[in-house]
């Protein structure tokens, strides 16, 4: 089956994002296709390059990035939610005349159209 995941919880503070990542790995291990992960609302914090967990904590942001590089899973974050929460890429930093970007490599700023497309092209969309 072809799946998409929507994550609405931050990298730290709730179980949503870590549960979503575990579910993503379970899907791939069972031979399913994971087309994309869409980060919405507080979920956009999973794409913050500046997140720096303690050395004895799991680095969820880099784990998502690893999912992208190893399995080619698209990591889309809602551009409106991201900008409201201070998550920006180089293009937006330039447009807004900000000194730098903080979007973790592997993530892409996207509109809700990416979520709509996933809903239309996947067999299941699972929200965390």
UniProtKB/Swiss-Prot annotation:
GO biological process terms, semicolon-separated: tRNA wobble position uridine thiolation
Subcellular location as annotated: Cytoplasm
Top-rank taxon: Bacteria
Main subcellular location: cytoplasm
Enzyme class: transferase
Keywords tagged on the record: Cytoplasm, Transferase, tRNA processing
Keyword Cytoplasm part of the UniProt annotation: yes
Keyword Manganese in annotation: no
Residues the record marks as active site: 78
A Gene Ontology cellular-component term: sulfurtransferase complex
Gene Ontology molecular-function annotations: sulfur carrier activity; sulfurtransferase activity
UniProt cross-references to InterPro entries, sorted A to Z: DsrEFH-like, Sulphur_relay_DsrE/F-like, Sulphur_relay_TusD/DsrE
Record-listed E.C. numbers: 2.8.1.-
Signal peptide span: none
Job of this protein: Part of a sulfur-relay system required for 2-thiolation of 5-methylaminomethyl-2-thiouridine (mnm(5)s(2)U) at tRNA wobble positions. Accepts sulfur from TusA and transfers it in turn to TusE.
Assembly with partners or alone: Heterohexamer, formed by a dimer of trimers. The hexameric TusBCD complex contains 2 copies each of TusB, TusC and TusD. The TusBCD complex interacts with TusE.
PANTHER family the record matches: PROTEIN YCHN (PTHR34874), SULFURTRANSFERASE TUSD (PTHR34874:SF3)
HAMAP family reported in the protein's UniProt record: Thiourid_synth_D
Family: Belongs to the DsrE/TusD family.
Protein name, as recorded: Sulfurtransferase TusD
Organism this protein belongs to: Salmonella dublin (strain CT_02021853)
Upper lineage: Bacteria, Pseudomonadati, Pseudomonadota, Gammaproteobacteria, Enterobacterales
